[in-house]
Amino acid sequence: MVLRLSKLFLRTLREDPADAEVASHRLLVRAGYIRRAAPGIYTWLPLGLSVLRKVEKVIREEMAAIGAQEVHFPALLPKEPYEATNRWTEYGEGIFRLKDRKGGDYLLAPTHEEMFTLLVKDLYSSYKDLPLSIYQIQNKYRDEARPRAGLLRGREFIMKDSYSFDVDDAGLDASYNAHRAAYLKIFERLGLEVIPVAATAGAMGGSRSEEFLHPTEIGEDTFVRSAGGYAANVEAVTTVVPAEIDFSNAPAAEIRDTPNTPTIDTLVDAANQLVPRDENDGGAWTAADTLKNVVLAVTLPTGERQIVVIGVPGDRGVDLKRVEANIGAYLPVAGEITVEAAGEEDLARNPLIVRGYLGPGMSLGTPLLGLEGAAKLLYLVDPRVVKGTAWVTGANMAGKHVFGLVAGRDFGWDGVIECTEVRAGDEAPDGSGPLETARGIEMGHIFQLGRKYAEALELKVLDQNGKQVVVTMGSYGVGVTRAVAALAESNHDAKGLVWPRAVAPADVHVVAVGRGEEIFAAAEQLSLELEAAGLEVIYDDRPKVSPGVKFGDAELIGVPTILAVGRGLVDGVVEIKDRRSGEAENVAVEKAVDYVVNAVRSK
């Protein structure tokens, strides 16, 4: 097929869009691939659709290779299935809800677990029907509070989501591993580097979970990896827990006056003055000897705001994303939550919280937790706070701290939570070496859902013994529009996009440079011959556009090979340029088609 720029629905831009934050957003708009319709919502133009369809084609081929079958669900969904799994409430403000003229409740699909489950329940009833994997490529909708980065964080986006249905956990393992292998092939074929990392299940639920992260500095996800092969999203990293300490002979805790020490730094300075230690006692006090009690406000899916206090070593910061990922086990309702530092109003409603001198619930001073007549606050601790560890921490009285407060003797906690920042140099949980940190974009996410949705929606089949058993499920997603953005993000230079051949909107971009009829005739003939050879061709046949603009557009659009027909035609040659390397070569006209065909098929 030959796409002629004189006819193609396309306008390139010389200036960056005002709202563009990242290169992929800037270049996809400037090169005429997408146009903004509203915040987080984009229209796909012909060139953009070409790239999108090629990404989808690769996905479909690899899904077919593992026996997955394609279906297509509506994007407008009824409320009832989501009520059955409690996700109508759990999603909170994160979804688009609407009513029909009769008052019926609907939502624009954020995801389709319930619909897949009900479809299989409606059609299948025996173990003989399983295993089954089905998938769709469909629009999804999330009411993002702050859409950003173009296609990377939008309100409408396209995903491939597939689901596996098995009789038992062994079958689920096989389905999960098949999808995992297929995902690695998909990203390899697209030319997109990904790193599989351990992840949390979040609101999806289930057990085993992995993300496929594309490493890039603009990524929203932080992950860690070791030289020995460990890799995990920071939300899923588990702390190396120290051994418990025998505290039977530990000295009693002691409250001391520590005026003007509301921060860890001022507390450490005061500790070294008040209770100096020598090397035999562990050396000078450091932030790691202190227990910092951080007050957080958790907004539940219901909109209710709950105060939580978390105790962490003073040399560690709290990672709010890790808190969000792991605090669900201690909350009264499940679903997507937000966590932030408690504000002035939160603190005012809890007068027992003494800012700068907050301690855990204890028998010394004025206890925060369990105080008669006061509401109990949820108190969680970092895994490093183990029985027998002694701390310097707030005494819940202004200007006072307690020294030698022993965990498990002087104070307890409601639970343990992975919540602190993960640092480069921390030991990998599996002992495979120190961790290094990086950022990435989530390109895919796979889950072993288990029986969560099948139980809620009563998806059962008869097993070999004629007994009804609950089906076990897996969920597997790929961000299709996000893949386009990530490819643009990792394949561009100062002049424009540089698409990998697997997804480029064409194989070759032919440019007629000059105004002579013989130039346009030769460019036309070469375009037709390239098409006849099975290549996709963009042909810039615009008669009144300068060579500079044509070359600028060709480099902005980013097709891998540029063939220029110009002044060299009098010598019987055309210029063929590799867009990625920038290398150009003069090739005889009669050999140009074979040259381009070989270039396309060799990569």
Swiss-Prot record:
Catalyses which reaction(s): tRNA(Pro) + L-proline + ATP = L-prolyl-tRNA(Pro) + AMP + diphosphate
Tree of life domain: Bacteria
GO biological process: prolyl-tRNA aminoacylation
Classification via InterPro entries: aa-tRNA-synt_IIb (IPR002314), aa-tRNA-synth_II (IPR006195), aa-tRNA-synth_II/BPL/LPL (IPR045864), Anticodon-bd (IPR004154), Anticodon-bd_dom_sf (IPR036621), Pro-tRNA-ligase_IIa (IPR002316), Pro-tRNA-synth_IIa_bac-type (IPR004500), Pro-tRNA-Synthase_IIa_type1 (IPR023717)
Molecular function GO terms recorded: aminoacyl-tRNA deacylase activity; ATP binding; proline-tRNA ligase activity
Any GO CC annotation of this UniProt entry: cytosol
CDD domains assigned: ProRS_anticodon_short, ProRS_core_prok
Coiled coil regions, renumbered to chain: none
Subcellular location: Cytoplasm
Cysteine disulfide partners in this protein: none
Matching Pfam families: HGTP_anticodon, tRNA-synt_2b, tRNA_edit
Primary location group: cytoplasm
Keywords, sorted A to Z: Aminoacyl-tRNA synthetase, ATP-binding, Cytoplasm, Ligase, Nucleotide-binding, Protein biosynthesis
EC number: 6.1.1.15
Gene3D superfamilies per record: Anticodon-binding domain, Bira Bifunctional Protein, Domain 2
Assembly behavior: Homodimer.
Family named by the database record: Belongs to the class-II aminoacyl-tRNA synthetase family. ProS type 1 subfamily.
Function: Catalyzes the attachment of proline to tRNA(Pro) in a two-step reaction: proline is first activated by ATP to form Pro-AMP and then transferred to the acceptor end of tRNA(Pro). As ProRS can inadvertently accommodate and process non-cognate amino acids such as alanine and cysteine, to avoid such errors it has two additional distinct editing activities against alanine. One activity is designated as 'pretransfer' editing and involves the tRNA(Pro)-independent hydrolysis of activated Ala-AMP.
Domain remark from Swiss-Prot or TrEMBL: Consists of three domains: the N-terminal catalytic domain, the editing domain and the C-terminal anticodon-binding domain.
NCBIfam families recorded: PRK09194.1, proS_fam_II
Protein name (database record): Proline--tRNA ligase
